[in-house]
């Protein structure tokens, strides 16, 4: 009898154990296949990454020799607040994640890098979880870097962030992860936008910091949750900052499998209705509808559509990675164009000031008259008569009131005086970089030849192929 009772107890225990395991298996979500992600981003390829060290060295030399002298002489950084460092020239492409709180930005990064259920994964949750600007970059081992260390390291591209103060640096964190994708790209996760919170409560200029990252991002993902489309004043401010960057913006309607088909269509229309006043361009940004996390899609949803949308987004990301060197050269060339226009404007202001000054004139009153009404003296119209100057590249007239408010006109020299016997003229050097050296360097990448900036034999001095992913 005792043996029978013991046998019954053993059988009951096994049944209970089996039931518990079944419940545990049923409660654990099934993971999605990642082969499409690895194939699209070419993470399985064993070939080494393209070595652009020679091109980067030449690009850095062109910048320091031909662009930076004019940039410093006419204090361009005080107008645009965008100082280019060596770290920025050599940096990897940056992908920026923006959007309201708890829409899945951190979860999306975890999914792209396969960090879920690993010690490396970013913390996620239903509540606002990310209060820092988190830079996820490549490193030999898992390592966390404080913001003050990142800003102090001149080899990185984040040293200019010191200007936002110590309060911000405490909210900046870097994470190094040994991942193949991070060898070619850097991800930046941002704090979620909370409409009912004043940005002043953050203790640092949140919008200015966002603008800094926006100006340097190669691809910008603006993520939304279909269950809470909260488009308010703070999000409106964000899209105002994104103006002019429409070609880099990708809008993501995340967690799409959490809604039925009809509800998803309504949300899709509501999203466009809300964003239409904020994006005033003929061709709207691309919108991706999917669920970017590692678990299987919910049953009875458009799985094939979501998968195709995800692959399209991955192809977009891969294009930015493949074109990283072309983007870098195009960005430096565009920067050089703006520096040249700024120098021409300052030179014209100075020349007009000298022409209007007499022995009995009050210099301050004369220049105030010029700055208040530059059109009266044809300042900007005269610049448009110069070669290769577009009216769409001209800075705002109001910006020069502030610029000359802190930079006296008498502290500048005319462009004709910015020449030396050995070094040549600053203006001629930057024009040569814009029209010959940088286009030649760009052409040498596609042809796989060593850059030759002494002639136009390789690509000619004509127009370079259009790159729709380049920075504006």
Swiss-Prot record:
InterPro entries: Dynamin_N, EHD_N, G_DYNAMIN_dom, P-loop_NTPase, TRAFAC_Dynamin-like_GTPase
Species whose genome carries this gene: Gallus gallus
Region annotation (G1 motif) ranges: 99-106
Superkingdom as given in the UniProt entry: Eukaryota
Chain positions covered by the region annotation G2 motif: 127-128
UniProt-annotated stretches for the region G3 motif: 189-192
Glycosylation sites: 280, 388
Any one GO biological process: mitochondrial fusion
Main location: other
UniProt-annotated location(s): Sarcoplasmic reticulum lumen; Sarcoplasmic reticulum membrane
Protein name: Sarcalumenin
Its membrane topology: Peripheral membrane protein
CDD domains: EHD
Post-translational modification: N-glycosylated.
GO-annotated cellular components: mitochondrial outer membrane; sarcoplasmic reticulum lumen; sarcoplasmic reticulum membrane
């Amino acid at each position: 009898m005792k043996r029978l009772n013991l046998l019954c107890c053993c059988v009951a225990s096994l049944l209970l154990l089996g039931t518990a395991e079944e419940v545990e298996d049923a409660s654990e979500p099934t993971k999605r296949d990642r082969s499409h992600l690895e194939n699209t981003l070419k993470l399985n390829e064993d070939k080494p990454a393209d070595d652009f060290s020679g091109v980067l060295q030449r690009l850095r030399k062109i910048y320091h020799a031909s662009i930076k002298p004019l940039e410093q002489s006419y204090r361009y950084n005080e107008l645009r607040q965008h100082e280019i460092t060596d770290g920025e020239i050599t940096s990897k492409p940056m992908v920026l994640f923006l959007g309201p709180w708890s829409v899945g930005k951190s979860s999306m990064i975890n999914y792209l890098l396969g960090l879920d259920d690993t010690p490396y994964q970013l913390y996620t949750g239903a509540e606002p979880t990310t209060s820092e600007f988190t830079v996820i970059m490549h490193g030999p081992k898992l390592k966390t870097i404080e913001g003050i260390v990142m800003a102090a390291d001149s080899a990185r591209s984040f040293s200019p962030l010191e200007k936002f103060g110590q309060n911000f640096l405490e909210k900046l964190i870097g994470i190094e992860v040994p991942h193949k994708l991070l060898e070619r790209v850097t991800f930046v996760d941002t704090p979620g936008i909370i409409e009912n919170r004043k940005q002043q409560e953050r203790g640092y200029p949140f919008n200015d910091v966002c603008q800094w990252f926006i100006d340097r991002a190669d691809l910008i993902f603006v993520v939304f949750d279909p269950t809470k489309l909260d488009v308010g004043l703070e999000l409106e401010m964000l899209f105002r900052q994104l103006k002019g960057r429409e070609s880099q913006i990708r809008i993501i309607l995340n967690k799409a499998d959490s809604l039925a088909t009809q509800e998803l269509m309504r949300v899709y229309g509501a999203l466009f209705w809300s964003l239409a006043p904020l994006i005033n361009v003929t061709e709207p940004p691309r919108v991706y509808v999917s669920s970017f996390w590692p678990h299987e899609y919910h049953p009875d949803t458009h799985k094939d559509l979501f998968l195709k949308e995800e692959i399209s987004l991955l192809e977009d990301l891969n294009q930015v990675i493949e074109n990283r060197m072309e983007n870098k050269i195009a960005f430096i060339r565009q920067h050089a164009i703006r520096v040249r226009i700024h120098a021409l404007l300052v030179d014209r202001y100075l020349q007009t000031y000298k022409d209007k000054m007499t022995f009995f004139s009050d210099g301050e009153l004369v220049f105030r008259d010029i700055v208040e009404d530059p059109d009266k003296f044809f300042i900007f119209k005269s610049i448009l008569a110069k070669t290769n100057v577009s009216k769409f590249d001209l800075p705002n007239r109001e910006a020069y009131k502030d610029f000359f408010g802190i930079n006296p006109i008498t502290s500048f020299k005319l462009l004709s005086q910015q020449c030396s016997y050995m070094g040549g003229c600053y203006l001629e050097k930057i024009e040569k970089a814009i029209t010959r050296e940088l286009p030649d360097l760009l052409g040498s990448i596609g042809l796989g030849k060593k850059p030759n900036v002494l002639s136009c034999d390789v690509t000619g001095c004509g127009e370079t192929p259009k790159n729709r992913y380049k920075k504006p």
